[in-house]
Amino acid sequence: MRLSLSVLLCLGLALTLAQHNPHWWGNRNTIVHLFEWKWTDIADKCERFLGPRGYAGVQVSPANENIISEGRPWWERYQPISYKLVTRSGNELEFASMVKRCNDVGVRIYVDVLLNHMSADFEGLATGTGGSVAEPAKKSFPSVPYTADDFHETCEITDWNDRFQVQQCELVGLKDLNQNRDWVRTKLIEFLDHLIELGVAGFRVDAAKHMASEDLSFIYSSVRDLNINHGFPNNARPFIYQEVIDHGHETVTREEYNELGAVTEFRFSEEIGKAFRGNNALKWLQSWGTDWGFLSSGQALTFVDNHDNQRDSGDVLNYKSPKQYKMATAFHLAYPYGISRVMSSFGFDDRDQAPPQDAQEQLISPEFDADGGCTNGWICEHRWRQIYNMVEFKNTVRDTELTNWWDNGDNQIAFCRGSKGFIAINNNLYNLSETLQTCLPAGEYCDVISGSLVDGACTGKSVSVDGNGYGYIHIGTEDFDGVLAIHTDAKL
């Protein structure tokens, strides 16, 4: 009996550790969230942009059928009606083609999955993006099928410090599934297994804190291994990262979930926003990471903003503060902490705004200007030079340590990543002009923030590094960006 228990414990530990592995190709190590993109567009950009630029993976919007809401707000994607793979992003064939094409060029796909709930109340019969009908008010979803027996009793979350309410009542009216029921577990596992069969590498689990960790543990451990026909090794487990909003005073905590998979580290987003908005001196970022109360690096899915909190007021940065946003993202990708995800947004003026769509309410594909930036209402932060070049920086310096931290006692900082990379940031209202240790071999390096290395020439500023590793660093207040970054793969 003791031996059997030990074996079971070891197997359980192995499974949970495996669910922290994102299965990246080579030295790639950054995910991009292509929020509300069509599957055909993602496939094309995996081949033409994401793969060549060194992105490791794409988080895609929910793939299963959702309710059709008036005006088509973005959040309708979070109101599922069945597990058919039909949404405004495309159908199952298009989804499968996207996954294969992206895997073929080394870009993994992670699906935003909704295991907590089905659609909220809807007047009369609700119609889904795949033609299914349901009566959410009666908890009737025949295309699954689910009946009222498959849900928790109807109740509202009024006390966020009450575990029962948080995990068994309805989040903003969404019909709360009972993941302790065998039938519900079976349908959720079938859904995840189908996505794995199509070649996905893992899942972002929406509203994870609203489900008991023991129920999620059962579901995660029951899904199949990743599909070896898509380049995954034998016995590989899906990468799982879970949305658990924990500001440090929650009854349901992130620590209940971080052994099951990675957890979205919302404190990272909040604190990096405070720092680069000028509400906390950058000098304090030297101890960034667990010393700030964050999860351990391998358990934390980190981001400057996400599709939810970029729409909130407060300290979180988004694309509307571009200079500070680029500085924060550069720091995010340069500092050796966390599993990094960058945001790719569409423009919005109000919280509920739909993604770019035509008169028939079909999603519009992004188009591109002469500089490669997106048009048609898409922001595409991942295509900003200052961000995609930092993805390359992060790839180049992977597995190196942070060394030679420098700061001016305020909002100017710099540091090395081993002998492969150097970054400096100026968030003061006066120039940064210093001779600093870059830790790089002697030579001329292209600043990948102000430009790129193209055919052996730099389109932006360059930095001369002497035989002792020192270089003169200037970031003026008049500069378009408050960052300078150089690395060994950008040597002239």
From Swiss-Prot:
Q: Which organism is it from?
A: Drosophila willistoni (Fruit fly)
* The keyword Secreted appears for this protein: yes
Q: Which gene encodes it?
A: Amyrel
Write out the GO cellular component annotations.
extracellular region
Which InterPro entries does this chain map to? A-amylase/branching_C, A-amylase_C, Alpha_amylase, Glyco_hydro_13_cat_dom, Glyco_hydro_b, Glycoside_hydrolase_SF
> Which residue positions does UniProt flag as site: Transition state stabilizer?
D308
Keyword field: Calcium, Carbohydrate metabolism, Chloride, Disulfide bond, Glycosidase, Hydrolase, Metal-binding, Pyrrolidone carboxylic acid, Secreted, Signal
Which residues are involved in binding Ca(2+)? N116, Q167, D176, H210
What is written in the cofactor note of this entry?
Binds 1 Ca(2+) ion per subunit. Binds 1 Cl(-) ion per subunit.
Outline the subunit composition.
Answer: Monomer.
Cofactor(s) needed for function: Ca(2+); chloride
- Provide the protein name: Alpha-amylase-related protein
- Where does this one sit in the cell? Secreted
Name the family the entry cites: Belongs to the glycosyl hydrolase 13 family.
The domain of life for this entry's organism is: Eukaryota
> What SUPFAM superfamilies does this protein's entry cite?
(Trans)glycosidases (SSF51445), Glycosyl hydrolase domain (SSF51011)
| Reaction catalyzed | Endohydrolysis of (1->4)-alpha-D-glucosidic linkages in polysaccharides containing three or more (1->4)-alpha-linked D-glucose units
Residues bearing Pyrrolidone carboxylic acid are Q19
Q: Which cysteines are joined by disulfide bonds?
A: C46-C102, C155-C169, C374-C380, C416-C439, C446-C458
MF-aspect GO terms:
4-alpha-glucanotransferase activity; alpha-amylase activity; metal ion binding
State the signal peptide span: 1-18
